[in-house]
């Protein structure tokens, strides 16, 4: 009988952990590129603003050379994540991850340590 009780206890633990993992996974929804696309401005603290659209095809347009000065690499694409946006170079390597602060606003650090803010302007 003690083995059966132990088995039942283990089964309950597995069920609770599985249910918790499912609930947690469903709370981290990755926004679609269509939801995040639009006119954006990126600013490095005290260095001005670079503007350009983030297109639905995950491409960046506009003055990316301006942002390249701060990021140390030319951002050509972006990818949404559950908690923000990755800016990536031509090889698809992540340059920096920007964390979502509120609707339409993301902050992060450049590889050199400068603070950057990305904001929706439309």
From Swiss-Prot:
Entry protein name: Alkaline proteinase inhibitor
What the protein does comes down to:
Inhibitor of the alkaline protease.
Under the heading InterPro entries, the entry gives:
Inh (IPR022815), Inh/Omp19 (IPR021140), Protease_inh_b-brl_dom (IPR016085)
The primary site where this protein sits is periplasm
In the UniProt record, which is one GO cellular component term?
Answer: periplasmic space
UniProt-listed SUPFAM superfamilies: beta-Barrel protease inhibitors
Residue ranges of region Disordered?
101-122
Q: Which UniProt keywords apply?
A: Metalloenzyme inhibitor, Metalloprotease inhibitor, Periplasm, Protease inhibitor, Signal
Q: Where in the cell is it found?
A: Periplasm
Family per similarity comment: Belongs to the protease inhibitor I38 family.
Where does the signal peptide begin and end?
A: 1-25
In alphabetical order, the GO MF annotations are: metalloendopeptidase inhibitor activity
């Amino acid at each position: 009988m003690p083995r059966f009780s132990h088995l039942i206890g283990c089964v309950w633990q597995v069920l609770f952990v599985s249910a918790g993992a499912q609930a947690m996974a469903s709370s981290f929804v990755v926004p679609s590129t269509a939801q995040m696309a639009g006119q954006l401005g990126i600013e490095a603290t005290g260095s001005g603003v670079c503007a350009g659209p983030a297109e639905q095809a995950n491409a960046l347009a506009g003055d990316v050379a301006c942002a390249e000065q701060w990021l140390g690499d030319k951002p050509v694409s972006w990818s949404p994540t559950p908690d923000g946006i990755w800016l990536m170079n031509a090889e698809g390597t992540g340059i920096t991850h920007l964390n979502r602060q509120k609707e339409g606003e993301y902050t992060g650090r450049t590889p050199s340590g400068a603070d950057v803010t990305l904001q929706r302007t439309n």
